[in-house]
């Protein structure tokens, strides 16, 4: 009998973390590597937020808090939801975790039973299916194709719902594609959900503030107030506030769900880092002017990435509405051989050879459930982007 849990056979390590670690190892070994795999901003955490953390430390605000977060941050989150999303929550309806990933995991662990299904549009963030499996559920994948700009249609959602469906995971703007649903597109989905009152909505809004070209962000419970009682609206400070390592995610939802999630968290990590919570209060309540300034940089990089990738033989790339990713297709590269004689049979081989032959690290599309593609994070310097796309262009140009 194996010492390790049989549950581990159902899941795999995070491919995005694996790519980032591989790139870091090659750099440490002296290799010339440009990493386009990491899903985090290259900006520093704003100074006022760091000062708030320092102030908390100097004043001894470093003790335990309630298992799912301190009241001061819960109140700040309530203010954020009201200000940005027209959603009214009480502090008892707020859960704070060690990153958005823990919030999603807690919700699934608190609600899933054997046989329960969770609808996940593809391409998806790599952790969604594995978290469902760990919670004992069944991921049901619904392809949001490139022909529909990587967005799920109302008809697809309708056709995927069964009497076993418990959750629909919604992510806009999306990781890995950056696709954002307009109000009209989201309204069509909410109309379907209103016809199926047994289906709950898990809305991952982590990239809410990272949008471009006057795109108007919206979230399901905002669009359809009648969904409020069966929606968990998830967010965090990692992306918009350049606080990935501070590990603060949060959610608003029905009190009975939040209470169940608190029970899970009280028996796992207990409270998120207290100092990080005080920093998050300042992030949400403090000046927000740096966000549009950062977005100007992200938009410039997005436009650069889309142009240079579309100028590359065998690659085509859509222009996303948000986040800091592009998800180009490599359909025109499949079946060709590299200068090293390796046949590009799929996007995993493409990404592997790209790293080995050019030193550019990207994440292969199969990790996100839709191929043949790869994900590029353009949250890095213009210099690195230009050099990386130069190498990608050369690599693809030499395919035969």
Give residue ranges: language-model regions.
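PLP-dependent class I/II
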Residues: 2-4, 12-14, 19-22, 26-33, ...
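Substrate/cofactor-recognition hotspot
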Residues: 8
């Amino acid at each position: 009998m194996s010492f390790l849990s049989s549950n581990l056979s159902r899941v795999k390590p995070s491919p995005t973390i694996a790519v980032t670690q591989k790139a870091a190892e090659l750099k440490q070994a002296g290799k010339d590597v440009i990493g386009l795999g990491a899903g985090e901003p290259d900006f520093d955490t704003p100074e006022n937020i760091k000062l708030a953390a320092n102030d908390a430390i100097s004043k001894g605000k470093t003790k335990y808090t309630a298992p799912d977060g301190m009241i001061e941050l819960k109140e700040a989150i309530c203010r954020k939801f009201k200000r940005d999303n027209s959603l009214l929550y009480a502090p008892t309806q707020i859960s704070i975790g060690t990153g958005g990933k823990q919030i999603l995991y807690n919700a699934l662990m608190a609600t899933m039973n054997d046989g329960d299904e969770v609808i996940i549009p593809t391409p998806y963030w790599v952790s969604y299916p594995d978290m469902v499996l760990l919670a004992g559920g069944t991921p049901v994948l619904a392809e949001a194709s490139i022909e529909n700009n990587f967005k799920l249609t109302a008809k697809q959602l309708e056709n995927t719902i069964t009497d076993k469906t418990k959750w629909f995971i919604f992510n806009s703007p999306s990781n890995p594609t950056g696709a954002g649903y307009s109000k009209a597109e989201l309204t069509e989905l909410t109309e379907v959900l209103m016809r199926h009152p047994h289906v709950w909505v898990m809305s991952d809004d982590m990239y809410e503030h990272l949008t471009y070209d006057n795109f108007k962000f919206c979230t399901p419970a905002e669009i359809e107030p009648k969904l409020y009682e069966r929606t968990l609206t998830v967010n965090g400070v990692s992306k918009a506030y350049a606080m990935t390592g501070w590990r603060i995610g949060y959610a608003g939802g029905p009190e009975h769900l939040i209470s169940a999630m608190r029970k899970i968290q009280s028996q796992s990590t207990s409270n998120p880092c207290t100092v990080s919570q005080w920093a998050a209060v300042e992030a949400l309540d403090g000046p927000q002017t740096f966000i549009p300034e950062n977005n100007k940089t992200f938009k410039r990089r997005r436009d650069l990435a889309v142009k240079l990738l579309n100028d590359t033989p065998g690659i085509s790339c859509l222009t996303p509405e948000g986040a800091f990713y592009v998800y180009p297709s490599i359909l025109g590269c499949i079946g060709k051989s590299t200068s090293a004689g390796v046949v590009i049979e799929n996007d995993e081989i493409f990404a592997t050879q790209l790293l080995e032959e050019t030193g550019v690290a990207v994440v292969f599309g199969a990790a996100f459930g839709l191929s043949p593609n790869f994900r590029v994070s353009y949250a890095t310097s213009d210099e690195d982007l230009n050099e990386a796309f130069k190498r990608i262009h050369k690599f693809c140009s030499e395919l035969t």
